[in-house]
Amino acid sequence: MQPSSPNATNYLADNIQISSANLSQTEMVVGRDSADYTAMHSINVGVGNSFLRGDTDIPQESGHSFETPSNMSFTAGQWDTESLPPVDTPDALNKAAGRIRSLLRRMDHETVAYEDMQRNLHYAARVLEAVFIDESREGCNGNCKNLNCSRHSHGRDDQQQDNNNSNRSCSLQEASPGGAGAGVTPGADNQDSIESRTKGVSQAPQTHSGPTGPPSNTSSETIAQPAPKLQPALETVRESVMEESPSKDPGDKGPPPPASTSTLTSQTTTSSSATAEPSAKAAESQAGSAGSSGSCSNPAAVHRQRRLRTPTWARSMSTNKTRLADEDDELSEVQPDAVPPEVREWLASTFTRQMATSRRKSDEKPKFRSVAHAIRAGIFVDRMYRRVSSSALTAFPPDVVRLLKNLDDWTFDVFALTEAASGQVVKYVAYELFNRYGSIHKFKIAPGILEAFLHRVEEGYCRYRNPYHNNLHAVDVMQTIHYCLCNTGLMNWLTDLEIFASLLAALLHDYEHTGTTNNFHVMSGSETALLYNDRAVLENHHASASFRLLREDEYNILSHLSREEFRELRGLVIEMVLGTDMTNHFQQMKAMRQLLTLQEATIDKQKVLSLVLHCCDISHPAKQWGVHHRWTMLLLEEFFRQGDLEKELGLPFSPLCDRNNTLVAESQICFIDFIVEPSMGVMSDMLELILAPIAPMNKSKPATLVEHETTANSTTNSAIVIPNSGITPSMDKPRDHRTEAKTTAAECLARKSVTGTTASKFNIPKPWLTCLVENKRIWKEQAVKDAEARALATAAEEAAAAAAAEAEESKPETETADGEQSEPAAEPADGAAA
């Protein structure tokens, strides 16, 4: 399903302006650069304010004034990102924050077009990537060589004052010595600090391709002879500036800055005249300074303009003393639980690498004044991405949402789901599970590509219209492996990539199944059997067809994986899919039992996940009776169709494929006794062995619970593998029910002797035990009834055959009697004739 098309009513205007009346708060202008954007509402955002509205995990301050549906006025064209400033400019963060904040609020009312959401999120992500910090917590003594230091902006000695004057104006602009800098108070300087820094950037062309480049009107001659007092400060930029060549006459002036960079809200302009007048004068003075920057002969001004290309939040903004709070105070505003692990790792790796190249040797530990803001931005983008990815596919039907709440249960009914989902079960269940485990976000799967991929997978499963091996079976196996990952704790033993591979393998393990067995392909000499040399014919086809589908760009959900990640995922998926070949069942069980008997067994993850998927593939007899019986009837119907085809081709019937000669109940009892129950037992022991070291020790259970578990285990016929011992009950034939209690007691004693008390052993939930017992009981009752019915049918057939035989025997006797009666009558006639 496609998202709704963009229209003027689907969007929320981010008409937010930040009032600069309060100097203790961050000065930002968040809004559109259009002439129609005049009537705006004000909102005061402090340092600690979050980007998110209504979030309880991020502290928020009062003063927010969000738009209501009545004042939402946005056209579809205004969501374009072409009008936004470059990602490395000072106001890029504010613009991106306003954009995404508006998107978030709009999503609370109506849907937003996916294309607009994608463009704005991409812009916000690039803004975050442009962030880098060049400060440390170490204080400045007023004599450092860093021109970015706040004390250089407000120095009190003559040298510092001259630096201030040279940084704020060019040599062609006349200024009284010592007067300009001394007359500016810290408050006034802070009021126009962002505006003054924006002036230099606004002259460069605004693109999204990265830095706007250094000023092209700076002459190399000017840089060659810097002022002596600025010589130490400009050593770091001399080499890069010398490489530039003049492209303009020094007398030319650059274009005036856009009005958007100095636009103030109506609320700001109508504040107090005493505040507005100095601001206007400062803005005028800075406009003149920026206008004459093209003819600037002062190297400090060149250095200043080069610094303006650095994002505002990445430089020192400590001119306002209220913003010189400790970094720990800023970070304390963000709770650790509010930061997703992937965002935290990204922040740590990114900021650490960039700071390592910019900090001085004397710094012992880098301190980041803007980490808190970056974390908040990262949290916001992360949540927005999750919301977009979860709403990219159209909303799930209410009945589907209700049924998906039981997705974590062993008794999940996929047949009820397919009725509510109109047959599109792969689309809803696969998307739900990928989203629950975070695979969509972690591996950057585009929602549109994921939707197309799931649609093709569903088509592949429905291609041959199989009664059993169809999209329902794929979803059933995928939900079962989800239960094993989630409820047993197996997911804690795996990486994100391995979890994603497990879900993907379960989804694709029978992709494009033909509805026939491997033996049928071999016996009939099909093209698939010839292609794969009669070995795991269908399983090889499932894996090959799946990766052939993933190779197409419009269905490739693995496009953002690295080469190593793709190789690992492909190997794991292929191994798991090939492990579903039933011809390898007993060999697989034997190998795992041998590993479990070792004292210090090292079990490969591929073998573990292959066994888990294999058990999930044959697990329907371990589900509740209603689901299991329905699956059994569907599987037998598929077998019978193969038998009909074999009859047409003149091939012998495969087992259980003859409609007229199949013992359904007996076959299911044997399947449970010899295949399913031993497999589930081995899987349980394997999971308990590998998960025990990473799971907390279970507390001592109540005696009634232990007794209940012992009773439940005693009613099963599973071949239990005892860890760290060689005791394995025989699988040659089902155990006699008369000796079942004795055998179970012996197994319990053996367990206690090897593993100690029951309370100290790590146990996983085994809801299949009761289902297996119940299903076997019902099948046995059904077998008795079937035997009686067959006996009656046999008796009836025998009676009918006897009756037919008697009828055949009585018929010749009647003919003989008639012949004897006709002979005496003929004799008198002969005598009369004589």
Curated annotation (Swiss-Prot):
GO terms for biological process: cAMP metabolic process; cAMP-mediated signaling; cGMP metabolic process; male mating behavior; sexual reproduction. It is an enzyme of class 3 (hydrolase). The gene is Pde1c. Binds 2 divalent metal cations per subunit. Site 1 may preferentially bind zinc ions. Binds 2 divalent metal cations per subunit. Site 2 has a preference for magnesium ions. It catalyses: a nucleoside 3',5'-cyclic phosphate + H2O = a nucleoside 5'-phosphate + H(+); 3',5'-cyclic GMP + H2O = GMP + H(+); 3',5'-cyclic AMP + H2O = AMP + H(+). Keywords: Behavior, cAMP, cGMP, Hydrolase, Magnesium, Metal-binding, Zinc. This is Dual specificity calcium/calmodulin-dependent 3',5'-cyclic nucleotide phosphodiesterase 1. One of its GO terms (cellular component) is extracellular space. Residues 364-387 are annotated as: Calmodulin-binding. It comes from the Eukaryota.
